[in-house]
């Protein structure tokens, strides 16, 4: 079992700028990618343009039953 990368554990971070960009962050509490408004600068690396990219990087791999 692999855990998501450290960047997926970061909180959402709007940043100090005033843009209103729709982005997605990985919520490690709910294990889901959730939308937030990004200001356009600074912030952190838990910031994805699409839910698909967020899930590809951060979603834990599904357990496969090998029985």
Curated annotation (Swiss-Prot):
It comes from Bos taurus. It is found in: Secreted. GO terms for cellular component: extracellular space. Residues 8-58 form the BPTI/Kunitz inhibitor domain. InterPro entries: Kunitz_BPTI, Kunitz_BPTI_sf, Prtase_inh_Kunz-CS, TFPI/VKTCI-like. This is Colostrum trypsin inhibitor. Keywords: Disulfide bond, Glycoprotein, Protease inhibitor, Secreted, Serine protease inhibitor. The record marks 18-19 as: Reactive bond for trypsin. Glycans are attached at residue 27. GO terms for molecular function: serine-type endopeptidase inhibitor activity. Disulfide bonds join 8-58, 17-41, 33-54. SMART domains: KU. Pfam families: Kunitz_BPTI (PF00014). The lineage of its organism: Eukaryota, Metazoa, Chordata, Craniata, Vertebrata. SUPFAM superfamilies: BPTI-like. CDD domains: Kunitz_ELP-like. Signal peptide: none annotated. Transmembrane segments: none annotated.
């Amino acid at each position: 079992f692999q855990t998501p990368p450290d960047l997926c554990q970061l909180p959402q971070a709007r940043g100090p700028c005033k843009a209103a960009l729709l982005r997605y962050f990985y919520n490690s509490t709910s294990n889901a990618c959730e939308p937030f408004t990004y200001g356009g600068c600074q912030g952190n690396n838990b910031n994805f343009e699409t839910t698909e990219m967020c899930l590809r990087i951060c979603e834990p791999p599904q357990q496969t039953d090998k029985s």
